[in-house]
Amino acid sequence: MSLELLSKLETKIQAALETIELLKMELEEEKQTSSSLSEQNQQLQQELTSWNEKVTGLVGLLNEEVN
């Protein structure tokens, strides 16, 4: 191989490595976002369960008053 071809190959390899590093950083950001959204989802599900229990209790009280 000529030095020119080796230089081009080195440039392409360097660009590929930089792309891989950028993709790794993006993946880490996405993992953090996913984790945060998962925690938020769990909290919202707990709040929904709590509200459903409260509403069920209030409906039960209303039914007792009506009967």
Curated annotation (Swiss-Prot):
Subcellular location(s) per record: Cytoplasm
A UniProt-annotated Pfam family: ZapB
A GO CC term attached to the entry: cytoplasm
GO BP: division septum assembly; FtsZ-dependent cytokinesis
Keyword Cell cycle: yes
Keywords, in A-Z order: Cell cycle, Cell division, Coiled coil, Cytoplasm, Septation
Coiled coil: 3-59
Highest taxon in the source lineage: Bacteria
Family: Belongs to the ZapB family.
Function: Non-essential, abundant cell division factor that is required for proper Z-ring formation. It is recruited early to the divisome by direct interaction with FtsZ, stimulating Z-ring assembly and thereby promoting cell division earlier in the cell cycle. Its recruitment to the Z-ring requires functional FtsA or ZipA.
Assembly information from the UniProt record: Homodimer. The ends of the coiled-coil dimer bind to each other, forming polymers. Interacts with FtsZ.
Protein name: Cell division protein ZapB
